[in-house]
Amino acid sequence: YLVNPAAYAALGAYMFLLILIGFPINFLTLYVTLEHKKLRTPLNYILLNLAVANLFMVLGGFTTTMYTSMHGYFVLGRLGCNLEAFFATLGGEIALWSLVVLAIERWIVVCKPISNFRFTEDHAIMGLAFTWVMALACAVPPLVGWSRYIPEGMQCSCGVDYYTRAEGFNNESFVIYMFIVHFLIPLSVIFFCYGRLLCAVKEAPAAQQESETTQRAEKEVSRMVVIMVIGFLVCWLPYASVAWWIFCNQGSDFGPIFMTLPSFFAKSAAIYNPMIYICMNKQFRHCMI
């Protein structure tokens, strides 16, 4: 054991809790949306996409991590490590790029930079395809030799190799690519869209043709998406910051817990998105009941 066995027991229990909440809540989101026609709006396709990404994380990643934390090290070998890290990365990236698509959708609908634009089913499907392409562009390279997935922290879960400059893997270039293309750029787009959105909401009453109910509905959706973004940042920023610090200070000393805590905190992302969605979407709650 790298650390006190009790820490592994706590980790296992935490993962069990995440599976216990994460699976039903994401499955419910999927099921209710597919069951009720009126919920099948283009915007909800993206939220469905988030639920699918979370299920990937729960089934592909969390189950593996719970199993390995019972053993105190990563027992599933190279293949298991690759699979677990792939699903965790894919899920996290689909969530991030889905938030980008939602942010762009909010910006276009509320700020109307393109007049007479309607967010249709085709746009939603293009948005979905885009999130998957971008997520795969981040999760696949370590499987095919550009960087690699290795056990991290307490060695119960795997992630991208920020730790070493291993020969032949080009870790540095991948980590820099990942941070810029799959973290900074999406966040910049999200912040740009919400910056414009806040300005538009302030200027809105002066130039409004739409009914009050439409406005209220748009505001509610915007509020929900903003809270999802804040939730994403709360979950993923500590992990990204620690990973970047380790990458910049390779060879310096840090304990296994240092990387484990933010990494496992980030995993809670699979629960909060559907919770926000269920808590803030009246129509969804009615259909659920």
Swiss-Prot record:
The record marks E84 as: Plays an important role in the conformation switch to the active conformation. Keywords: Cell projection, Chromophore, Disulfide bond, G-protein coupled receptor, Glycoprotein, Lipoprotein, Membrane, Phosphoprotein, Photoreceptor protein, Receptor, Retinal protein, Sensory transduction, Transducer, Transmembrane, Transmembrane helix, Vision. Residues 1-7, 68-81, 145-173, 246-257 are extracellular. The keyword Lipoprotein applies. A motif ('Ionic lock' involved in activated form stabilization) lies at residues 105-107. It is a multi-pass membrane protein. It comes from the Eukaryota. Glycans are attached at N171. Pfam families: 7tm_1 (PF00001). Disulfide bonds join C81-C158. GO terms for biological process: absorption of visible light; G protein-coupled opsin signaling pathway; visual perception. Photoreceptor required for image-forming vision at low light intensity. While most salt water fish species use retinal as chromophore, most freshwater fish use 3-dehydroretinal, or a mixture of retinal and 3-dehydroretinal. Light-induced isomerization of 11-cis to all-trans retinal triggers a conformational change that activates signaling via G-proteins. Subsequent receptor phosphorylation mediates displacement of the bound G-protein alpha subunit by arrestin and terminates signaling. This is Rhodopsin. It comes from Abyssocottus korotneffi. The lineage of its organism: Eukaryota, Metazoa, Chordata, Craniata, Vertebrata.
